[in-house]
C-alpha cells in the first residue's frame, strides 16, 4: 500500500481565475484543449507537463484552472499569445491568481464558497440523473 506524500514534499499549486471571450459557448473539453494547445505552442511538451494544467471548475465564460506554482509566468504568456480556436478569434483573460480555490471564488469570481460536503448533499437531494 502506498503512503501519501507529506505536505512539504507535495507539488505547490496555484489557482487561476480565467475569463474566456469567444463567440460561442465552450464545453469543458474545449477549454482544456485550448489551454493545452496554447501551452504546447508556446513552451512545448516539456513546458506543458511542467505547468500541469487542470480545470477545476468551468461555467461559461469563467473558469478555475490549477497549475504548478513555478509555471505561472509560462501560463500567462502562452494564454496571451492564443489568438484563435477553430478559426474564430478567442481571448483568454486572467482575472487573478491565488493559492486557494476559496479565495479565487470569493475575491475574483464573487461567488460564495460552499464546502464540498454541502455540494454533495445538494446533489443527493436532487436524485439520480435520468
UniProtKB/Swiss-Prot annotation:
Catalytic activity: Endonucleolytic cleavage of RNA, removing 5'-extranucleotides from tRNA precursor
A biological-process GO annotation: tRNA 5'-leader removal
Temperature-dependence annotation: Optimum temperature is 36-38 degrees Celsius in the absence of L7Ae, 48-50 degrees Celsius in presence of L7Ae.
Subcellular location: Cytoplasm
GO molecular function annotation: ribonuclease P activity
Keywords in alphabetical order: Cytoplasm, Endonuclease, Hydrolase, Nuclease, tRNA processing
SUPFAM superfamilies to which the protein is assigned, alphabetical: Rnp2-like (SSF160350)
InterPro entries: Pop5/Rpp14/Rnp2-like, Rnp2-like_sf, Rnp2_archaea
First-listed, main subcellular location of the protein, grouped into a coarse class: cytoplasm
Complexes and interactors: Consists of a catalytic RNA component and at least 5 protein subunits.
Name of protein: Ribonuclease P protein component 2
Gene (name only): rnp2
Amino acid at each position: 500500500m502506498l503512503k501519501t506524500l507529506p505536505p512539504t514534499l507535495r507539488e505547490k499549486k496555484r489557482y487561476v481565475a480565467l475569463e474566456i471571450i469567444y463567440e460561442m459557448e465552450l464545453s469543458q473539453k474545449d477549454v482544456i484543449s485550448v489551454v493545452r494547445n496554447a501551452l504546447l505552442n508556446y513552451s512545448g511538451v516539456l513546458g506543458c507537463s511542467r505547468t500541469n494544467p487542470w480545470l477545476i471548475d468551468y461555467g461559461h465564460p469563467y473558469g478555475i484552472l490549477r497549475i504548478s506554482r513555478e509555471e505561472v509566468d509560462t501560463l500567462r504568456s502562452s494564454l496571451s499569445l492564443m489568438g484563435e480556436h477553430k478559426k474564430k478569434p478567442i481571448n483568454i483573460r486572467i482575472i487573478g491568481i491565488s493559492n486557494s480555490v476559496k479565495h479565487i471564488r470569493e475575491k475574483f469570481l464573487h461567488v460564495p464558497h460552499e464546502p464540498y460536503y454541502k455540494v454533495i448533499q445538494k446533489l443527493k437531494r436532487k436524485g439520480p440523473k435520468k
